[in-house]
Curated annotation (Swiss-Prot):
Protein name: Peptidyl-prolyl cis-trans isomerase Mip
Family, similarity comment: Belongs to the FKBP-type PPIase family.
Originating organism: Chlamydia trachomatis serovar D (strain ATCC VR-885 / DSM 19411 / UW-3/Cx)
EC number(s) stated in the UniProt entry for this protein: 5.2.1.8
InterPro entries: PPIase_dom_sf, PPIase_FKBP_dom, PPIase_FKBP_N, PPIase_FKBP_N_sf
Domain PPIase FKBP-type: 152-235
Main location: membrane
GO CC, one annotated term: cell outer membrane
Signal peptide annotation: 1-14
Substitution effect: S56A: In strain: L2
Role summary: PPIases accelerate the folding of proteins.
Recorded name of the encoding gene: mip
Key word Isomerase present: yes
Length: 243
């Protein structure tokens, strides 16, 4: 059973679904009906049905490409009934690789176009300073009064990273403590964007994917990254004293 669960969850993580109707008109009555039905289930039935919910939830977490949920369920039942799949394992792997590759390339192009459009428009906004043409910009949110950072020291800071749509993908604030970060270990746009910051300053960095993770890493490929950074302390001699 453990092997079955592991395989199904591993499969589910990679694939999204289509065909789900989330119409809100009958949501309350549907929920009440579901609660009545659930109360009549045995413990094993509850466990099994909850696993189905978990599988569906895992399937819907990614938007790389879509599968037909109805056909997914039919395929599971066919396997249980001992029937053959419409594709051999080799054919499936080949077609899946082709679909994933095409989806990845489309997402790369789409995100790159969005990043370049954003930077082009953003540089015209008040307070935005361009450090590298169409690649790296920043805006000062709060002026600092401490020492000026230069080079790549180890910096004590708070940061929040987000995408163009405002979705946060990482933040030091989640741990309530600032992070001590060697600027030699971060993406180029982050360390370059912090140059000239004063201790106490809060700055928003706008980083083109070429100066971030590009098409590699765990984030969506060619994502423009936005970091709000507060420099608390530059822990290195490679700083200058503010006049």
């Amino acid at each position: 059973m453990k092997n079955i669960l592991s395989w199904m969850l591993m499969f589910a993580v990679a694939l999204p679904i289509v065909g789900c109707d989330n119409g809100g008109g009958s949501q309350t009555s549907a929920t009440e009906k579901s609660m009545v039905e659930d109360s009549a289930l045995t413990d094993n039935q509850k466990l099994s049905r909850t696993f189905g919910h978990l599988l569906s939830r895992q399937l819907s977490r990614t938007e790389d490409f879509s599968l037909d949920l109805v056909e997914v369920i039919k395929g599971m039942q066919s396997e249980i009934d001992g029937q053959s799949a419409p594709l051999t394992d080799t054919e499936y792997e080949k077609q899946m690789a082709e679909v994933q590759k095409a989806s990845f390339e489309a997402k790369c192009s789409e995100n790159l176009a969005s990043a370049e459009k954003f930077l082009k428009e953003n540089k015209e906004k008040a307070g935005v300073i361009e450090l590298e043409p169409n690649k790296l910009q920043y805006r000062v949110v709060k002026e600092g009064t401490g020492r000026v950072l230069s080079g790549k020291p180890t910096a004590l800071l708070h940061y929040t990273g987000s995408f163009i749509d405002g979705k946060v993908f990482d933040s030091s604030e989640k741990n309530k403590e600032p992070i001590l970060l060697p600027l030699t270990k971060v993406i180029p746009g982050f360390s370059q964007g912090m140059q000239g910051m004063k201790e106490g300053e809060v700055r928003v960095l706008y980083i083109h994917p070429d100066l971030a993770y590009g098409t590699a890493g765990q984030l969506p490929p060619n994502s423009l990254l936005i970091f709000e950074v507060k420099l608390i302390e530059a822990n290195d001699d490679n700083v200058s004293v503010t006049e």
